[in-house]
């Protein structure tokens, strides 16, 4: 199939100029998801495929019709690919993401539809343990939730000093210096919750840095381990520090939550951190490369029933 040069785009405006028709969006998806843009049946990858006159394809072995949307987050959606591309761009390439309210205004859909679209996109960035971290690795946790002082007197949480944030959701982070970050929403910050993700995600040859929290007490038994004693005002000791992951919490997570999303529920929080991690992990590539990477992740589909279950 003849290849198309889609050019470069570095803003939402130029994105819409490049993808000014639905056909161009389809061709772009085919170029990214199918090798050499040659159609592959989602029902039988070994089958011969026939091209129909209406833009659909037919799988010879199963007799089923399909298009590039099948098997992606765009499957079953009545929203045009142009609007989907805009949503993907804003969620992944915009500095702090975009709220469902603003997205609904931008692409003229209901807030409910925009909310569903953004969560489908975040679900596509679901994190796994396949890519192991090595070298110098920082560990830390953050807590997401409103400030206790801002709550009505009868809704204030008791006993929420130190790490006993009973009113907040804990999120653990694992960051490889000069590389990527991995985040997981956990039930609490005990060693039983923090240790398994570390063992799964970090190679035993790595050197780990964290603060003095007892939730990491088993780490020295497996890894070369250095502690930064924040409790005594020590934040850097030679190469021992957790400043990188703390900067990630502030610049990529808290700015988006406080500035755009305002409130994030525990139920959906992991998806938001999928989004934050994706932006951080693609921080050194161009905007159109980041967009292309986002499209490559769009091979899964979150249903509305699962989202709201």
Residue ranges and their predicted role:
Residues 1-309:
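Residue-level recognition of single "structural anchor" positions
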